[in-house]
Amino acid sequence: MTKPLTIAVPKGRILKDLIPLVRRAGLDSTPLEENDRRLVRPTADGAFRYVFLKPDDVPTYVEYGAADLGVSGRDTLLERRHDLYTPLDLGIGRCRLVVAGPEDTEVPDLPRVATKYPRIAGDHFASKGVVAEIIPVHGSVELAPLVGLSHLIVDIVETGSTLRENRLEVLETVTEVSTQLIANRASYKLRSDVIRPLVERLRAATAGAGR
């Protein structure tokens, strides 16, 4: 019996965007839509099994071979720098990683920067010749400049409404972010007969969504 292909998917908002894409690709999305607490859910035909994880954990499971494929944000991949193959941009979860700060505030030459993405932020400021003190935080990044923890933040922005509500403004875009299909390097080679057709079906579904 052929071993099912294991696909790691993130819980939360991205999963809601992923379901219509999976449907358009002609794949069984039923396990993704089931409202239960099982973390491993096979498809009816046994060809695939979905593993439900916290978004930050998806690349780790794929890199170490616990999952053959996964769905992960480009921001996580850039920050964590796992050894993975990225065959397809799924075109969902689009947003920006930006530098932001208080409105009408002069930024010092040696700024403190609060962020969930210390490696990306450090590389960004270093590339501009700016010596910045990077302060890792894990939640409510917008709060940091309001209470004096930092002068700037580097964070994900979708609509910008949270920044505006906290009187912060975007100063520059670090990079565009979207959701990627990722693959374990060994699986992509050894199970290419299964994975590559799946990638092409998702590619066609992604292209169709853009029309």
UniProtKB/Swiss-Prot annotation:
Keyword annotations: Amino-acid biosynthesis, ATP-binding, Cytoplasm, Glycosyltransferase, Histidine biosynthesis, Nucleotide-binding, Transferase
Compartments it resides in: Cytoplasm
InterPro entries: ATP_PRibTrfase_cat, ATP_PRibTrfase_CS, ATP_PRibTrfase_HisG, ATP_PRibTrfase_HisG_short
Gene3D superfamilies hit by this protein: Periplasmic binding protein-like II
Record-listed E.C. numbers: 2.4.2.17
UniProt GO cellular component terms: cytoplasm
GO biological process: L-histidine biosynthetic process
Catalytic activity: 1-(5-phospho-beta-D-ribosyl)-ATP + diphosphate = 5-phospho-alpha-D-ribose 1-diphosphate + ATP
Pathway given in the UniProt record: Amino-acid biosynthesis; L-histidine biosynthesis; L-histidine from 5-phospho-alpha-D-ribose 1-diphosphate: step 1/9
Domain of life: Bacteria
Main location: cytoplasm
One GO MF term attached to the UniProt entry: ATP phosphoribosyltransferase activity
Domain notes: Lacks the C-terminal regulatory region which is replaced by HisZ.
Subunit structure as annotated in this protein's UniProt entry: Heteromultimer composed of HisG and HisZ subunits.
PANTHER family referenced in this protein's UniProt entry, alphabetically: ATP PHOSPHORIBOSYLTRANSFERASE, ATP PHOSPHORIBOSYLTRANSFERASE ATP-PRTASE
Annotated function: Catalyzes the condensation of ATP and 5-phosphoribose 1-diphosphate to form N'-(5'-phosphoribosyl)-ATP (PR-ATP). Has a crucial role in the pathway because the rate of histidine biosynthesis seems to be controlled primarily by regulation of HisG enzymatic activity.
Family membership noted in the UniProt record: Belongs to the ATP phosphoribosyltransferase family. Short subfamily.
Protein name: ATP phosphoribosyltransferase
Species the sequence originates in: Sorangium cellulosum (strain So ce56) (Polyangium cellulosum (strain So ce56))
Gene field: hisG
